[in-house]
Amino acid sequence: MGRKSSKAKEKKQKRLEERAAMDAVCAKVDAANRLGDPLEAFPVFKKYDRNGLNVSIECKRVSGLEPATVDWAFDLTKTNMQTMYEQSEWGWKDREKREEMTDDRAWYLIAWENSSIPVAFSHFRFDVECGDEVLYCYEVQLESKVRRKGLGKFLIQILQLMANSTQMKKVMLTVFKHNHGAYQFFREALQFEIDDSSPSMSGCCGEDCSYEILSRRTKFGDSQHSHTGGHCGGCCH
């Protein structure tokens, strides 16, 4: 009986430790989501004036955006990505994409030309993935006239900066394998790695999946992926 009782206590203690670890993860995500402007502490990153561009950058929750700006972001995403989605197992659905982009948890970086014309954006969230606190990048979309001028890379660097400042463990994103330009951009130019949770690594569907999950660790990320009792895709509410 003593051995059985000891094992039960060990299991209970392990559950308590896992719960405490997940509570700590969720506390960091909640703290990040309570910020008024995650970019406020980094004013130098609110301007991009290189390679012929001169844009201002702001960070807002989706609830703080004008409806016209949300419509622009959706239309740009559809223009840039609908064909890519239709070539995947996901397909393109206007309603589902709009719901994703207007979710209460959504944050946006918006790049403005002349302070009034939106030319690029990133949709991201502070969330929990596989037990880790992360900044998940859902979209980085640019108008054609501002591409290949370093702005997309600059927006991702801002995400990495904010992930570090909020003590997230990594920046994550999903990219289609057949979107060769984007895949090469993230893997080579930005040094993202295939995440342990990606289908090709986890073995859930491997080569049959049309996408990879990529990630880049912050200074708070462990050298190896660790599961702390959370589940992939989870959030703290």
Curated annotation (Swiss-Prot):
Q: Where is the lipid attached (N-myristoyl glycine)?
A: 2
Query: If you read the UniProt record, what top EC class would you report for this enzyme, in one word?
Result: transferase
Q: Which GO terms describe its molecular function?
A: histone H2A acetyltransferase activity; histone H4 acetyltransferase activity; protein N-terminal-serine acetyltransferase activity
What cellular component terms from Gene Ontology apply here?
centriolar satellite; cytosol; nucleoplasm
Per the record, where is site Essential for catalytic activity? 139
Q: Which domain of life is it from?
A: Eukaryota
Q: What is its EC number?
A: 2.3.1.257
Please give the biological process terms from Gene Ontology that the record holds. lipid metabolic process
Q: What is this protein called?
A: N-alpha-acetyltransferase 40
Q: Which SUPFAM superfamilies match?
A: Acyl-CoA N-acyltransferases (Nat)
List, for all copies, the residue spans of the domain called N-acetyltransferase.
63-216
Name the positions where acetyl-CoA binds.
140-142, 148-153, 179
Query: Where found, per UniProt?
Result: Cytoplasm; Nucleus
Please give the organism.
Answer: Mus musculus
* Alphabetized InterPro entries for the sequence: Acyl_CoA_acyltransferase, GNAT_dom, NAA40
Q: Which family does it belong to?
A: Belongs to the acetyltransferase family. NAA40 subfamily.
**This protein's UniProt keywords:** Acyltransferase, Cytoplasm, Lipoprotein, Myristate, Nucleus, Transferase
Q: Which reaction does it catalyse?
A: N-terminal L-seryl-[histone H4] + acetyl-CoA = N-terminal N(alpha)-acetyl-L-seryl-[histone H4] + CoA + H(+); N-terminal L-seryl-[histone H2A] + acetyl-CoA = N-terminal N(alpha)-acetyl-L-seryl-[histone H2A] + CoA + H(+)
- Null-mutant phenotype, please? Liver-specific knockout male mice have decreased body mass and are protected from age-associated hepatic steatosis. Male mice show a reduction in the liver triglyceride and free fatty acid levels. No effect on liver cholesterol level, liver weight, and liver function is observed.
- UniProt binding sites for substrate: 85, 127-129, 138, 174, 197, 211
**Function, in words:** N-alpha-acetyltransferase that specifically mediates the acetylation of the N-terminal residues of histones H4 and H2A. In contrast to other N-alpha-acetyltransferase, has a very specific selectivity for histones H4 and H2A N-terminus and specifically recognizes the 'Ser-Gly-Arg-Gly sequence'. Acts as a negative regulator of apoptosis. May play a role in hepatic lipid metabolism.
